[in-house]
């Protein structure tokens, strides 16, 4: 039995979720709602500057894409309430436009007949925020309809924080995400409500805000108010880095910290968190499927309890892999996902 999925919005994350979902024999991507022609969408799926050429045949049909012989319906509506989710018996909509992250707006998909909505961003008044590997056990299929997959940075930060807190206890901390530029910035200097993001993204290191530390309290509520942070947008197109400094409740060594991450990577956080002691750089983590990869060579301890940890993440592919994991997690707990 496959879960029937529709993707609303086909930008960077929408397309990566599509690529990953098409590899999963438990998921049927029924439809894509996007504003561009079939020819344009087919081309953008087949050829990707960051993640390379798609290894499946993609053909533009009439109001559809044909991927390795499988038809995916193409729609073009700016109003979720007008989408034919009831007609196609859609179980889960992946909301990837960035425009419908508030619950009242995302509910348009439910009014149209979908059973659940997964937001590929932090939500507003969402029913629950889930970070796989951290709090997926909090999902309640009876109560939760609008589900946020949080942000790519929160997906990196939360597993790292959880390991440190469970192993050693966290008093407080500060994080910086050294983040690849995104579509929310300008290629050349142009107006933006954030005057730093108004500057050319390929030319400067750009300090700006991140909600990752604040959002952490949604998945690890006992740490509310204990972590804060900011972002540095840097001139690379993909792969980012969380730089976390925490004060722990117990004395540790760098070796003990790294061993804790190694254990988690092999057990409770297998597939979500990984560990590396190789001298790698950001491009080496392109298309890495993990939410966070600990850079063991850079772990530092000062005065026994102040710890610095670096964690790499592919902010596009790694995050999209967690969206697909969340689809499977939600579908497995729904009473009657559609039979295919």
UniProtKB/Swiss-Prot annotation:
In response to oxidative stress, the active site Cys likely reacts with bacillithiol (BSH) to form mixed disulfides to protect the Cys residue against overoxidation. S-bacillithiolation presumably leads to loss of catalytic activity. Debacillithiolation by monothiol bacilliredoxin BrxC restores the activity. Pathway: Carbohydrate biosynthesis; gluconeogenesis. It catalyses: D-glyceraldehyde 3-phosphate + phosphate + NADP(+) = (2R)-3-phospho-glyceroyl phosphate + NADPH + H(+); D-glyceraldehyde 3-phosphate + phosphate + NAD(+) = (2R)-3-phospho-glyceroyl phosphate + NADH + H(+). The record marks 179 as: Activates thiol group during catalysis. One of its GO terms (molecular function) is glyceraldehyde-3-phosphate dehydrogenase (NADP+) (phosphorylating) activity. It is an enzyme of class 1 (oxidoreductase). The keyword NADP applies. One of its GO terms (biological process) is gluconeogenesis. It comes from the Bacteria. Its EC number is 1.2.1.59. The active site is at 152 (nucleophile). NADP(+) binds at residues 12-13, 78, 120, 183, 315. Disruption phenotype: Cells lacking this gene are unable to grow in medium containing asparagine as a sole carbon source but presents the same growth rate as the wild-type in glucose-containing medium. CDD domains: GAPDH_I_C, GAPDH_I_N. Gene3D superfamilies: Dihydrodipicolinate Reductase, domain 2 (3.30.360.10), NAD(P)-binding Rossmann-like Domain (3.40.50.720). Coiled coil: none annotated. It is found in: Cytoplasm. Keywords: Cytoplasm, Gluconeogenesis, NAD, NADP, Nucleotide-binding, Oxidoreductase. D-glyceraldehyde 3-phosphate binds at residues 151-153, 182, 197, 210-211, 233. Its main location: cytoplasm. Homotetramer. Interacts with BrxC. Involved in the gluconeogenesis. Catalyzes the oxidative phosphorylation of glyceraldehyde 3-phosphate (G3P) to 1,3-bisphosphoglycerate (BPG) using the cofactor NADP. The first reaction step involves the formation of a hemiacetal intermediate between G3P and a cysteine residue, and this hemiacetal intermediate is then oxidized to a thioester, with concomitant reduction of NADP to NADPH. The reduced NADPH is then exchanged with the second NADP, and the thioester is attacked by a nucleophilic inorganic phosphate to produce BPG. This is Glyceraldehyde-3-phosphate dehydrogenase 2.
